């Protein structure tokens, strides 16, 4: 066993990867009679307790007509409940020694909170109040709509954000993953309070909710309190899965001519969902290409050729079709050469296997980052709810670690040849062509 692997496994043990007898090894999962899924993880390592309430509501269930409605709803749920004003919600969270927030994403929406462990009951009551009894004041809806429209316009003025939004649109086509989570301006202009209320009533139902709690807590007491707090949560009718257009890989190149001190070059490829058997191997592939300062793009394009200021690559986890993308920022004068160099590395990793040293580095970096990201109860509860929402279930974190450890040089070459054959390229800069 090489020293890098020993170091990675030592870090894993130190940071509490499951399977090593840690008190936080596995959450207890229970589905309440109304359909709410509860995951409780006892972790005595810190005095802070955290909870994440996930709702299966997000861009995946939206259309062009209501694109952005989930994000808008999540911005307004904290603006008041039947028993608390927006200020009282914020003050209650602060008095618990923590905070509360809400957001939306492609496959889920979340209400999250943290508190000192002794205040866990009030923390859960606050989450339930916000989730089940928001008032969604008209003035707040209007204000958050304006703020979201401003944010969308701002993204058009940010070169990287504009290039990334364009890449996702070109990779996914008409699939909802191709739209910004913030939505579309035309759709947002049509969304009023009545539509937000209807959206909340449709999606904030017990069978669509996942509540994960992590901290110095007693599982039995938490389960009983959650059952009490969510006893009146609506249960039906069920919301069916959306009929989504197929995302089909296609070679494509988009040029955006835009004044910018730094040119952007991005390449994207359709990739498998998180539940796919190739998930771990594609994660390693993406890390070998763009993860950290020893990755291919950093060493070959930035260090050796001097053609980039920044490089990167990622493969975000999705319930539906994923995307593997690579990115670099460069001087406008080097844009064409930088694009050719990046595409050359993407082609090379399809033709030539990575070395055993590259494989070990990529796996070590990937697993080390994963361990570091799971050090706090806030992140542990988020991951527990996230993996449940993506339908890969309890224990996925441990299965994922084992799957990454098992990835071989041959696996990386195979998935590179499978998924990197049809690049979608976006290039942005003052002299882009």
Which sequence ranges carry the predicted segments?
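Positively charged n-region of N-terminal signal peptides that target proteins for export
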Residues: 1-5
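Boundary at the C-terminal end of the N-terminal hydrophobic targeting segment
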Residues: 18-25
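M16/MPP (pitrilysin/insulinase) zinc-metallopeptidase core fold and M16-derived inactive scaffolds
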Residues: 50-117, 180, 292-307
């Amino acid at each position: 066993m090489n020293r890098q692997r020993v170091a990675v496994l030592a870090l894993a043990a130190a940071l509490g990867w499951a399977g090593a007898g840690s008190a936080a090894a596995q959450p207890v999962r229970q589905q309440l009679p109304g359909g709410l899924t509860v995951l409780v993880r006892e972790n005595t390592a810190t005095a802070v307790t955290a909870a994440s309430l996930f709702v299966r509501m997000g861009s995946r269930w939206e259309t062009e007509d209501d694109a952005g409605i989930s994000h808008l709803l999540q911005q307004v749920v904290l603006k008041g409940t039947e028993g608390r004003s927006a200020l009282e919600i914020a003050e209650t969270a602060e008095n618990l020694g923590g905070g509360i927030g809400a957001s939306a994403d492609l496959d889920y929406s979340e209400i999250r909170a943290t508190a000192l462990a002794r205040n866990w009951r009030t923390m859960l009551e606050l989450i339930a109040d916000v989730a089940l009894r928001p008032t969604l004041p008209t003035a707040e809806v209007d204000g958050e709509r304006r703020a979201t429209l401003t944010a969308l316009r701002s993204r058009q003025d940010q070169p990287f954000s504009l290039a990334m939004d364009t890449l996702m649109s070109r990779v996914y086509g008409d699939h909802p993953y191709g739209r910004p989570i913030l939505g579309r301006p035309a759709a947002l202009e049509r969304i009023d309070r009545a539509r937000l209320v209807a959206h909340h009533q449709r999606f904030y139902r017990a069978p669509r909710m996942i509540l994960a709690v992590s901290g110095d807590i007693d599982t039995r007491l938490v389960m009983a309190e959650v059952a009490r707090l969510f006893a009146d949560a609506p249960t039906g009718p069920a919301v069916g899965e959306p009929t989504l257009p197929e995302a089909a890989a296609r070679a494509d190149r988009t040029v955006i001519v835009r004044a910018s001190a730094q040119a952007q070059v991005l390449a994207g490829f359709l990739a498998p969902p998180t539940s796919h058997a190739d998930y771990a191997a594609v994660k390693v592939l993406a890390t070998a290409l763009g993860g950290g300062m020893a990755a291919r793009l950093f060493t070959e394009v930035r260090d050796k050729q001097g053609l980039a200021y920044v490089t990167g690559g990622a493969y975000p986890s999705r319930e539906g079709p994923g995307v593997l993308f690579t990115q670099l920022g460069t001087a406008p004068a080097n844009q064409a050469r930088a694009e050719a160099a990046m595409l050359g590395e993407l082609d090379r990793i399809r033709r030539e296997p990575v070395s055993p040293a590259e494989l070990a580095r990529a796996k070590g970096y990937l697993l080390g980052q994963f361990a570091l990201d799971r050090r706090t109860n806030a992140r542990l509860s988020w991951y527990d709810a996230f993996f449940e929402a993506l339908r890969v279930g309890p224990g996925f974190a441990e299965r994922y670690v084992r799957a990454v450890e098992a990835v071989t040089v041959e696996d990386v070459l195979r998935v590179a040849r499978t998924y990197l054959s049809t690049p979608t390229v976006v290039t942005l800069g003052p002299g882009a062509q």
